[in-house]
Amino acid sequence: MKKLTTLILALLGLTGASCASDYEMDTFHTKSGKEVRFHALVHASIRIQYNGLEIQVDPVRELGNRTIDYTAMPKADYILITHEHGDHFDKEAIKQLEDKGTMVILNGRCSEMLGYGEKMKNYDQLHLSEDISIEAVPAYNITEGRTQFHPKGRDNGYILTLDGLRIYIAGDTEDIPEMAEIKDIDIAFLPCNQPYTMTTEQLVRAARTIRPRVLFPYHYGQTNVSGLPTELKDDGVDVRIRHYE
């Protein structure tokens, strides 16, 4: 089973990781051979490079004692914002990454706060080009005493499809029932930061529901996620721990 899983991952280009500059980088290939690079910036901030394009997810300049210099990066073609909290939504970071051709894609609340952008609500779909599409999916809390953090219907997760490579960026959520509808995911970013998102037990349940080929726990703060690769080993999920504290 392990050899078969490795073979499938290799055929999909879902193997190997490398370091680029100051950030860990994982490189994947789409079925037609186009390269996709993921740079682990911080917490929930992800830089994605695809086919000459720059995609930034929830860019923030500062978190704890870590800072990100977005002025040293290329301007973004697309910026995705999941919700309004300060560890996901940073107006100044957006300004530093914007050019006249940049499209900012965000939920309704962030659109109001920013004053512009391509607004998406849960289940909206957006076709950006022949080979790029985005679907907004629910992201919310369900545990009693936590629902005020991320109420149902307000925030977004995103399924980003790049030349057939399906990437699930969950945003701040628990293991909600809607995850059963999320299928054929190649790469998933799932949050693990109690009490705001998932416990490690919830993340394992979510991973077993979604069954991504590769899983990056992210947004994990001080939560110990080191045991997740072992816990999900027999489920055929390649868990990669990067600096998404």
Give the location of each predicted region:
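Active-site HxH/HxHxD metal-binding segment of metal-dependent hydrolases
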Residues: 68-129
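Zn-dependent metallo-beta-lactamase
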Residues: 1-51, 231-235, 244
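Active-site environment of divalent metal-dependent phosphoester hydrolases
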Residues: 62-65, 85-89, 111-114, 125-127, ...
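Pre-active-site segment of Zn-dependent metallo-hydrolases
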Residues: 23-33, 41, 45-84, 91-95, ...
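Binuclear metal-ion centers of metallo-dependent hydrolases, dominated by the metallo-beta-lactamase
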Residues: 115-132, 152, 204, 208-245
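Active-site neighborhood of phospho(di)ester-bond hydrolases with catalytic His/Asp-centered motifs
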Residues: 56-59, 76-87, 104-108, 168-171, ...
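Active-site-proximal loop/helix segments of hydrolase catalytic cores
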Residues: 141-209
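Beta-strand-turn-beta hairpins that frame and shape the catalytic cleft
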Residues: 30-38, 49-55, 125-135, 161-167
